[in-house]
Amino acid sequence: MREPTAHRKARILCALILFSVVSGCATESHQAVQVEHTASSAVPYRGARNAIAVGKFDNRSTYLRGLFSDGVDRLGGQAKTILVGHLQETGRFNVLERENMEENAREAKLSGKQQTLQGADFTITGDVVEFGRKETGDAQLFGILGEGKKQAAYSKVTLNVVNVLTSQVVYSASGAGEYALSNREVLGFGGTASYDSTLNGKVLDLAIREAVDNLVQGMENGSWSPRASR
């Protein structure tokens, strides 16, 4: 038995109205997020920039190094990228990039020019010595009145300044930080936070910024010099 035309039209109309309501609820937004910088980068510096190389940055914490880890040190790689940026932003160093040596050599060859690579007296190495995440939650009246959830990430890093000729560690600087995110739902209003993977990068950036500031402070108070004595 065929459905009456009037009923068919009514169903189509309802579907169109529902689609328009759903489409009207969909919103898109975007905004620029302020990038955090080291305190050292805000202090004017008129001295000479000294060449410094960045070596390995390893994850020495237990985070992402369990039995089922694939062996790729993503945390260390992320930390090294952050370190290079913050060192350069201080205005005290000419940071030497060693990750893309083959690519740079190929581009120089294609341009028909000879490379003039610069050496450094010191290499900065780094380690993520502590890293962890935790989630805590609470409920009011067994969750009837509301519940909350808090995510926290903690990181501690250590930077070592190594003399390239003697392999001596001439200076060390550390930094640590904690980031937290919390949401609360009360009587059905609000929402609890889902897992936020960006906390890893934020807390790592915070710890490295502090370590770089301590490194620069040590240089400026004479505890170490980016130029080896001749």
Label each region the model flagged:
Residues 103-170, 180-194:
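Surface-exposed short loop/turn segments
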Residues 25-95, 100-109, 181, 187-230:
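A structural "domain/chain start" motif
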